[in-house]
Amino acid sequence: MNNALNQLQPYPFEKLRALLGSVTPNPDKRPIALSIGEPKHRSPSFVAEALANNLDQMAVYPTTLGIPALREAIAGWCERRFGVPSGWIDPARNVLPVNGTREALFAFTQTVVNRSDDALVVSPNPFYQIYEGAAFLAGAKPHYLPCLDENGFNPDFDAVSPDIWKRCQILFLCSPGNPTGALIPVDTLKKLIALADEYD
């Protein structure tokens, strides 16, 4: 059994559910759930129709990498959405459909972290819970960068020592931040890319 399992914290949404379990919302107000990012809108009709027309395929495992048409559609959307040149994103090499970000972030961390006594996974704090769990189970220690009001709720990357950067195997970033909503300035992203090149 992986000894790192003992380091895992209860998932925050379970804590939140327990805290809110005895709360009775004001009946005159509609509560706004600020927890799990589940879609609150109806699925588009073409999606519902496609699912209904393919119910006989629901018990069939998908291909490991997803069907080529899906990967091509995702690559095309990314190119349009982010303005990258056509063909820049290779659907066969750069796209992997997954069942949510937790699956992808966890698998990525297990793949790239080289277990060692000084391995660090650096993340903002507050953070998306999978960052910490993936770090522990990959044999690394989480290193938290506080997201404070005086920094616009972004980490102060200038305060990170060279020793931390040397030991950093993954830096988790999310813009807008989860859960703060803070945007990371482009100049900061460029600086972080330069640091990754320097310390890799």
Annotate each PLM feature.
Residues 59-198:
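Conserved core of the PLP fold type I
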